[in-house]
């Protein structure tokens, strides 16, 4: 879907500032990457954000390029149901403590800018243990990595023709990621990992180029492993139908410790079952 060429859209419809921000991140992460030498048009073509049309033989944005780098008012011309919504609900007495919507007109409203704005909001309350490498403090943790994966996964696997859009909710004790569209691998395979079948393959490529997202299908299992290591309640994957939606719920509640007496009773029950 996201490989389609938008033959009637000029390349100038993409947001220049978003493109430059993305390129700067790419250069910083991979200074020797050969794409760094390309001009903007060649670069967009190389990452899949633009392609030569078979109709007029000119360069036009792809669907992925429009979603990643376009302005919201241009994106909705091609994806009428497109909507990105971040809701922060940390105080129960206030409806929203923070909100970011793609349709506000206060920013570009594209996927690239949404990702970085929302990620910064998600991690601002995460406690970072003091750790240094070669004298430099490391502010990244497995929890940061898991949240990057969860947010990218939500965007990469969304059906942008589906209704109700993408919703990310940050609450006091959990974060919920919702995207339109069913899980193409099924929720059990998502947990198991090993199979990657993203709905938007070019979007995945563009995130991978800046070191975001796991292409090998191990991203969701890594999230589960991180939550296990933290002692938090296991993440929940929900599938809803009519309309199709996929939810990933990450709770920060600690697992309830099993009492010693309960463990002994469980062992007795298992032993008795085997004897009978």
Where does each model-flagged region fall?
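Short beta-strand/loop element within the Bergerat-fold HATPase_c
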Residues: 167-173
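Conserved alpha/beta core segments of nucleic-acid transaction machinery
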Residues: 243-271
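Structural motif
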Residues: 174-176, 245
